[in-house]
Amino acid sequence: MSISAIITAYERIEQTLATLRVIQNCMPPPDETLVHVDANQLACENAIRNDFPSVRILRSEDHVGPGGGRNKLVAAAQFELVASFDDDSYPIDSDYFARALRIFEKFPEASLVCAALYHAGESIGLDERSAHWAADFSGGACIFRRQAFLDAGRYVPLPVAYGMEEVDLAIRLHSQGGKILTTRWLRVFHNTDLKRHGDPRVTAGSIANLALLAYLRYPVSLWGIGVGQCANRLLWLLRHGRRRGILRGVTMIPPHVWENRRYRAPVSKKVVRSYLALRRAPVVVEL
């Protein structure tokens, strides 16, 4: 079994190059590495070509966001298993890809395997051989089954995707009987302290995206759950002092929903409740 590695890049050239170095130094390395360069960032593309001539590069002239970039990368990947990273996330363990292959061999029913993700300033946990079936995943620290990703309909491409892209795809995978396995035996380091999450644009997007998620995937009878999720997000932002961007987020809900209405494909009430139940109570398995 072979594995592709994909990275979404934008403006952060040095971080992208650092991530590529770690990935290429893994033992064994992935069988191919692809990078998507967003928004016509030619300087980033040229730097990658100069330092890593064997890496396949895809570039979008428009700003398609990380989800839009991953859509293109997964579609272009040669192999069925696709390990996904951000421009500032990379494996902690040098045998990451070998471990990933062993996990997929043991759990052929897994549509996606998600690693334990650690951020700058956090204590890094041991690589315990533990795992559980989960509802959600992190797009910068996971391995997709390529066909399952494509069959689920890929990501909704959003420039600011916080609170939307991964949950949306997870719900659609769940509706198709797909399963997400999370394990601490795979570890990924996200080289950020998450300060950018305080950006007003991120705050606004996280509010509008929750409303969009409810509109796109929930049946009308469950839209009340979406309202509650938006309210909880607002309360969390207020408690954490992230007031800048809240008003913008609320007012952008109607146009945001309208612009993305073509993606509406609600799942059943049973699927939504099953997904939320799994989120509350993951199922432990033996690795």
Where are these regions (language model features)?
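Short, acidic, metal-binding catalytic loop of nucleotide-sugar glycosyltransferases
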Residues: 21-30
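Short beta-strand/loop segment that forms part of the nucleotide-sugar
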Residues: 30-40, 58-60
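A conserved acidic beta->alpha catalytic loop
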Residues: 37-45, 89-90
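Glycine-rich, basic loop-to-helix element that forms the pyrophosphate-binding segment
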Residues: 60-77
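Short aromatic/hydrophobic "clamp" motif used to bind/position activated sugar donors
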Residues: 82
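Conserved donor NDP-sugar-binding/catalytic core segment of glycosyltransferases
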Residues: 90-127
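A short, conserved alpha-helix in the catalytic core of glycosyltransferases
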Residues: 142-144, 148-153, 159-187
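Non-catalytic, C-terminal membrane-associated alpha-helical segments of glycosyltransferases
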Residues: 205, 222-287
